[in-house]
Amino acid sequence: MWSVTGALTVAVPPTAAACRTKPFLISSSFPKQTKKLHLSSPSLSLPSSHFSSSFKTAATSIEQQSSVNKGESTKYHFLVANAKFMLDEEEHFQEQLFERLRYFGERELVQDFWLVIEPKFLDNFPKITQRLRRPAVALVSTNGTWITFMKLRLDRVLYDSFEATSLDEALASNPTTLEFDKPKNWVAPYPKYEPGWWDTFLPKVTQESAV
């Protein structure tokens, strides 16, 4: 140590107390660490089965909630035109529907679109029925974006939407038999679609009631 007095600098030897080894400021109660510390506890690492079961539990609760809320209304979008145009003349309409049905099947999706012959919900749209030749056919879906796309493809159709509390209510129809005359001269290089191709897209409740 150095002591400064006036202008003189005198060397003072360190005392014995200053030379003592000072203890570390760490409690002796801590255990001696012989291994590297881990920032995360091994008990926090959960197996993948835990997340799988959690997901199943969440999915189950969602299903239960949806079953409780069956009384809530759902919005349905639809395109409608006369049956002759929609089912017999507009051939690429059939191709669009079967392509979408194949897409849903490959990805195991629940079908959300249907064809409804003479739908009962048209009674609530007098402005549409005034412009519509009968019998009429509607393409109904809960997917508004896809219905907008189909409207651009079909062009000569009318669009609107409505709400219903059940699928049976939304897809209810009046019994109608469709018969189209076969063309006298078919010039296309492929055979014409057979009548009844649309049965695949009719609501299941309608098919069962017709039996």
From Swiss-Prot:
Task: Respond yes or no to whether keyword Protein transport is given for this record.
Answer: no
Swiss-Prot/TrEMBL keywords = Chloroplast, Plastid, Transit peptide
Molecular functions (GO terms): magnesium-protoporphyrin IX monomethyl ester (oxidative) cyclase activity
UniProt xrefs under InterPro entries:
Ycf54 (IPR019616), Ycf54-like_sf (IPR038409)
Q: Which Gene Ontology cellular component terms are annotated?
A: chloroplast; plastid; thylakoid
Give the UniProt subcellular location, in the record's own words: Plastid, Chloroplast
GO biological process terms, alphabetically, are:
chlorophyll biosynthetic process
Q: How does it assemble?
A: Interacts with LFNR1 and CRD1/CHL27 in chloroplasts.
Q: What is this protein called?
A: Protein YCF54, chloroplastic
Q: Which organism is the protein's source?
A: Arabidopsis thaliana (Mouse-ear cress)
